[in-house]
Amino acid sequence: MTVTGIIAEFNPFHNGHKYLLETAEGLKIIAMSGNFMQRGEPALIDKWIRSEMALKNGADIVVELPFFVSVQSADYFAQGAIDILCQLGIQQLAFGTEDVIDYQKLIKVYEKKSKQMTAYLSTLEDTLSYPQKTQKMWEIFAGVKFSGQTPNHILGLSYAKASAGKHIQLCPIKRQGAAYHSKDKNHLLASASAIRQHLNDWDFISHSVPNAGLLINNPHMSWDHYFSFLKYQILNHSDLTSIFQVNDELASRIKKAIKVSQNIDHLVDTVATKRYTKARVRRILTYILVNAKEPTLPKGIHILGFTSKGQAHLKKLKKSRPLITRIGAETWDEMTQKADSIYQLGHQDIPEQSFGRIPIIIKNERLN
């Protein structure tokens, strides 16, 4: 049987994700962000609820991306996720994209020219953000064009780069329905942005989200729940440069900006520059929130849930792979577990996120 990997956030899970799972082949293993997202935001609903939604709609196994993989720039996010999926025996990687191009060809380009491409990045002016530099790199070396509204396509290029030398097949699937950032409700396949924007419209949610009750009946989290914690961390931290990726310039800008900022958007807008994108600033603020220092990655793979079919695959891997099914006396990743504790502080109804939790098991693989 073909084993297909999918890298996801499911923030939240919606009909577009269900379409991706239905279109992908074989046994589907999801490497999913935990309780903090790649662009530096707390998850709308917790990782266990999102895992359950995925398993009820086509996923066979859901594993958790460690904090220092989840909350990273696209290249590191892709590299960390693909490394984990390869340990789980995937043969191909499926992903949604605005532009279906020959990503396999791009893998070959990077395998042949990685040194030249990396060297080229270092020649570009520092006024450009890293995403702008990588876009120029792909344009020069592979002739890839960018429309400016293709976040999944850009992530697909990071998947191509991370897949070099891995012997896996990239399987792009054309994104259906609303655009990534669209807030339009008039789509059967509405975007995650639209769903987050219209959470109080239950009729819209029930049509846009499979198993909508899991979304409707659980706490909805945002930066608003954590801004006071962040403000405390910034104002009381003696040396922000000890936090991952915070340099002297950013430390100064953040310390000044927090004194006049009433919410996360104001703070991000004040700190961000051409060089420091809003996404990067949000990630750095997340690092400050959870007091993240130099990154270390766990050796084990944390299993959030599986179906009967997924369980059979995991049994084959158990003796040769460090699979973690319960965090207790046996710890998994200190940084992720600390981030989970802070996430839980945001709402009294969020249950324990790490210790003692066991994988979600769906006996019938296609419960809709």
From Swiss-Prot:
Main subcellular location: cytoplasm
Location in the cell: Cytoplasm
Annotated protein name in UniProt: tRNA(Met) cytidine acetate ligase
Protein species of origin: Streptococcus pyogenes serotype M2 (strain MGAS10270)
Pfam families associated with the record: HIGH_NTase1
Family: Belongs to the TmcAL family.
Presence of keyword tRNA-binding: yes
Chain sites annotated for binding ATP: 7-20, 96, 152, 175
HAMAP family to which the protein is assigned, alphabetical: TmcAL
Organismal lineage: Bacteria, Bacillati, Bacillota, Bacilli, Lactobacillales
Domain of life: Bacteria
GO function term, MF aspect, one: tRNA binding
One cellular-component annotation, GO: cytoplasm
A GO BP entry: tRNA modification
Functional note: Catalyzes the formation of N(4)-acetylcytidine (ac(4)C) at the wobble position of elongator tRNA(Met), using acetate and ATP as substrates. First activates an acetate ion to form acetyladenylate (Ac-AMP) and then transfers the acetyl group to tRNA to form ac(4)C34.
InterPro entries: Rossmann-like_a/b/a_fold (IPR014729), tRNA(Met)_cyd_acetate_ligase (IPR008513)
Record keywords: ATP-binding, Cytoplasm, Ligase, Nucleotide-binding, RNA-binding, tRNA processing, tRNA-binding
EC number annotated for this UniProt entry: 6.3.4.-
NCBIfam families for the chain: PRK13670.1 (NF010191)
Gene that this polypeptide is encoded by: tmcAL
EC supergroup of this enzyme: ligase
